Amino acid sequence: MASKDDAGTSNVVTRFAPSPTGYLHLGGARTALFNWLFARHYGGKALLRIEDTDKKRSTQDAIDKILEGLDWLGLDYDDTPLFQSERGSRHVEVAEKLLEYGYAYRCYATQEELEQMRAAQRAAKQPQRYDGRWRHRDASEAPAGSPFVVRLKTAEDGETTIEDKVQGRVTVRNEELDDYILLRADGSPTYMLAVVVDDHDMGVTHVIRGDDHLNNAFRQLPIYHAMDTIEGGWPEPVYAHVPLIHGQDGAKLSKRHGAVGVEAYRDEMGVLPEALFNYLLRLGWGHGDQEEFTREQAIELFTLEGVGKSASRFDTKKLLNLNGHHIREADNARLAALVAAKIGPAADEALLTQAMEVLKVRAKDINELAEGAAFLFSKRPLEMTEKAEKLLDGEGRERLAKVSEALSAENDWTIEALEATTKALAERLELGLGKLAQPMRAALTGTTTSPGIFDVLVLLGREESLARIDAQATPAEEGANG
């Protein structure tokens, strides 16, 4: 049976189909990204389906977080999201057609019978799967009014082969596939049926998902084949099963590796969306040795041929290094707004924007930017770190008094003028510039790390800079008014 048009043609349709039972985790975000990029690369459609049939576990909060996370990453979707729970009647319609044409059957086996079957299989060390006991029996053999499920009639011999765009050719013996349930005893459709019907009705041409779904593909294909025989127009999609993301220890990424939702990388870790976009792109896909990609480059270059067969390892350090690069490339006003949100009401966005060029040089995340900018809004007396306190010994305070005197006489409060004045003072005192700059930094910021000391002086302004220096240059017993 022919599959839909292969990669490289027009009319590509992909879908991202999360279950709203939790946050949008990294694996899901990467699947969404790969589907979106593939569709955009070929000028096709990227669709979104919310698989919310598990009403006990699906929540509106999870749906909101998924949509918010996708929007934050810049993954826009064509058409409105499709909610699987609203399509139950369509799923049942297909199951009934499969029943009508002999591709499915009613199974009246009781739970007790199925438990006995599994126990016997365990005892015989056989694979545990349904044994087809109602496949060739007539419904009249069941007691009147007995509950039943509807099962798919899968091939009993031969093989099924999938030409997967990532895994290559994969073949299974049909005897390994059981007659799985399409409709439960309460008449509700199962995931396996709903996925196929929805993919068909949405016109999905390429199913790109984690390789933990590879076995599902072999179970889903018979529905395509049967429905194509019954009514035509049910070509199977092209499959691409992407290896999962692992932690640094090689195990599947999980909460113990720090795996959290996309919103945590934004809100708690201070990662920019373009950095996570770039990092997820490189988790399992490559284009030569290139590490950094703009959104436009990613769309232009992304193909399934670039997806590797082996699992990729998530590395927080690499993500933050990449994030640092994107911070340095980012617009200062945008960064200032993000930092202001971290600092709170005391923040001055205009001052932060002015400071951002020097603040962002070393920062790897928005949290570090906020920490680096905190000195701008500190109230006197400044709280000192232990290392800063050590620089403000008697000798350091004496030098600050001389710095204050020299800077007070400087009318041109610019980086160049302040640097010249301070260097002249250091030469006069026969000191290296660092011997003055270190206690100055401690007095001005309360820390031993900051942007260049002359940048700090300009950002704080003349009045505040001299007030902070004087507060530390004055002996403690006289400094209560500082």
Curated annotation (Swiss-Prot):
Span of the annotated motif 'KMSKS' region: 252-256
Enzyme class: ligase
Residue numbers covered by motif 'HIGH' region: 18-28
Biological process terms in GO annotation: glutamyl-tRNA aminoacylation
InterPro entries: aa-tRNA-synth_I_cd-bd, aa-tRNA-synth_I_codon-bd_sub2, aa-tRNA-synth_I_CS, aa_tRNA-synth_I_cd-bd_sf, Glu-tRNA-ligase_bac/mito, Glu/Gln-tRNA-synth, Glu/Gln-tRNA-synth_Ib_cat-dom, GluQ/Sye
Reactions that this protein is recorded to catalyse: tRNA(Glu) + L-glutamate + ATP = L-glutamyl-tRNA(Glu) + AMP + diphosphate
Main location (coarse class): cytoplasm
Keyword terms: Aminoacyl-tRNA synthetase, ATP-binding, Cytoplasm, Ligase, Nucleotide-binding, Protein biosynthesis
Quaternary structure and interacting proteins, as annotated: Monomer.
Protein name: Glutamate--tRNA ligase 1
Organism: Erythrobacter litoralis (strain HTCC2594)
